Curated annotation (Swiss-Prot):
Residues reported to bind (6S)-5,6,7,8-tetrahydrofolate: S110, L111, L112, P113
Leading EC class: transferase
Taxonomic superkingdom: Bacteria
Pfam families registered for this protein in UniProt: Formyl_trans_C, Formyl_trans_N
Function: Attaches a formyl group to the free amino group of methionyl-tRNA(fMet). The formyl group appears to play a dual role in the initiator identity of N-formylmethionyl-tRNA by promoting its recognition by IF2 and preventing the misappropriation of this tRNA by the elongation apparatus.
Protein name: Methionyl-tRNA formyltransferase
Keyword field contains Nucleotide-binding: no
InterPro entries with a match to the protein in the record: Fmt, Formyl_trans_C, Formyl_transf_N, Formyl_transf_N_sf, Formyl_transferase-like_C_sf, Met-tRNA-FMT_C, Met-tRNA-FMT_N
Provenance organism: Mycolicibacterium smegmatis (strain ATCC 700084 / mc(2)155) (Mycobacterium smegmatis)
Family assignment from sequence similarity: Belongs to the Fmt family.
Any Gene Ontology CC annotation: cytosol
Reaction(s) this enzyme catalyzes, per UniProt: L-methionyl-tRNA(fMet) + (6R)-10-formyltetrahydrofolate = N-formyl-L-methionyl-tRNA(fMet) + (6S)-5,6,7,8-tetrahydrofolate + H(+)
MF terms in GO: methionyl-tRNA formyltransferase activity
Sorted UniProt keywords: Protein biosynthesis, Transferase
């Protein structure tokens, strides 16, 4: 089939690679978001998907307004049989959805109808899900609500960050997307409506939602930090200093040195503990402003923290 691939960030790359390498399909163009400012100098940089397309000599489509009359006409001229989508980053109008005869097939990183929305991987980890997955479905105007072609499941590990889990789902999801496109091409796949029960929503992660709430139970603090690692990164205030924090370890044994109130920090010879709504957690890494991630105990010694000090 003639395919247009729509995607932007790094997790879309395994899917694009598989479709480029497939002998059954021809990726005639790649749709991605316009170049965005990156780095300290803010110089515009092509998206990861754009860079891969350029390496393979595939025409790039980077409209500022993908639902404009001009772009609808441009896509119509390409006459794609199907459009495959992985994290493109924009809502699509009904006119655009109607262009390819087999529609737009999206790879979503959850087991729909669970975790519809922008941050399904983060939501699954924060909620303590033990199993998640990826779903291919037909895009329709309502958010992530279209009929399902296929799913693949993935175990959520106790130490998974969003980055870890997304990397695995990107690989297994790419294989699922290729199988789905193959099945649509040969007529062996039929989409099944999503159930009306079990719908949950995963809204976009905001800077404020990534702030650590030390008043929550330790296991919840742990999950919520891992859910926003590496991006945008969990953060907290220590005095007047805003720092990012990496994944933590729940450490009930630290209570032997006395209780810690939520947010209260205890600096040991080789450790930094913070109180939560239940048990203390041990900080692994801290990233001060303008610096790289570093060992939390090393940072605390260098910062010469004087107790009592708290995170908030």
């Amino acid at each position: 089939m003639r395919l247009v691939f729509a995607g932007t960030p790094e997790p879309a790359l395994p899917s694009l690679r598989r479709l480029i390498e497939s002998p059954r399909h021809d990726v005639v163009a790649v749709l991605t978001r316009p170049d965005a400012a990156a780095g300290r100098r803010g110089k515009p940089r092509p998206s990861p998907v754009a860079q891969l397309a350029l390496e393979h000599g595939i025409p790039l489509l980077r409209p500022d307004r993908p639902n404009s009359d001009e772009f609808v006409a441009e896509l119509t001229e390409l006459a794609p049989d199907c459009c495959a989508v992985v994290a493109y980053g924009a809502l699509l109008s009904q006119r655009l959805l109607a262009v390819p005869r087999h529609g737009w097939i999206n790879l979503h990183f959850s087991l729909l109808p669970a975790w519809r929305g922008a941050a399904p991987v983060q939501a699954a980890i924060a909620a303590g899900d033990t199993v998640t997955g990826a779903t291919t479905f037909q895009i329709e105007p309502a958010l992530d609500s279209g009929p399902v072609y296929g799913v693949v499941t993935e175990t959520v590990r106790d130490t998974d960050t969003a980055g870890d889990l997304l990397e695995r789902l990107s690989d297994s999801g790419a294989e699922l997307l290729e199988r789905t496109i193959d099945g649509i091409a040969d007529g062996s796949l039929t989409a099944v409506p999503q159930p009306s029960e079990g719908i949950t929503v995963a809204p976009k992660i905001t800077v404020e939602s990534a702030r650590v709430r030390w008043d929550l139970p330790a296991h919840v603090v742990d999950r919520r930090i891992r859910a926003v690692t590496p991006n945008p990164g969990a953060w907290t205030m220590i005095g007047e200093l805003r720092v990012k924090v990496g994944p933590v370890t729940v450490d009930q044994a630290a209570e032997a040195d006395g209780p810690l109130a939520p947010g209260e920090i205890r600096v040991g010879r080789n450790s930094v503990h913070v109180g939560t709504g239940s048990h203390p957690v041990r900080l692994g890494q801290i990233q001060p402003p303008g610096k790289k991630l570093m060992n939390a105990a090393d940072w605390a010694r260098g910062a010469r923290l004087e107790e009592p000090v708290s995170a908030s």
